[in-house]
């Protein structure tokens, strides 16, 4: 599991361990089981080799490593683009590839679930680079699902909406986050527990691949021509 030291990844790991599963977390944080920078091909291969040597080939991979990037397109610089695309797109591809190669060589098949974002399809002028990186992630999932289906490897994603994690901070004290939360039909931000439930459910869907499950409390249901949305008074 990438990004398993905090946030959504940590909650998925906690739930799996509570159920008696063996979990190996990869992260740049010290609390991870294996230190791994997902943007570094050598580090990914080393983490994969160590995981297999110590625990065998995993059959369920949760890829939740990610970084944020705010700012207007006219103001951002190339290094910000490189950073967010390196982690959210390149890092996802490197870890997906490592997972698929391991399961293919072992002949086990299995499930890969990436944690992406509703930002892949909801344009936000203050988060252009992030939106682009998550759109790339969603398409990587779909292409990988098509390519690796003959190997018995399913590839899906869960796309959270506004979720309370260390990456996001406290929505109540962050104006650009509080706005989307106020427009969420279910009336609150998501929690790592909410997204962990979705991730674990998708792993168990044996005849589903190439899908992106939206877990956003209904945020993406809004129509641009219906600004009141769910708050419209009933007749």
Descriptions of predicted regions:
Residues 191-215, 220:
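C-terminal substrate-recognition "lid" of short-chain dehydrogenase/reductases
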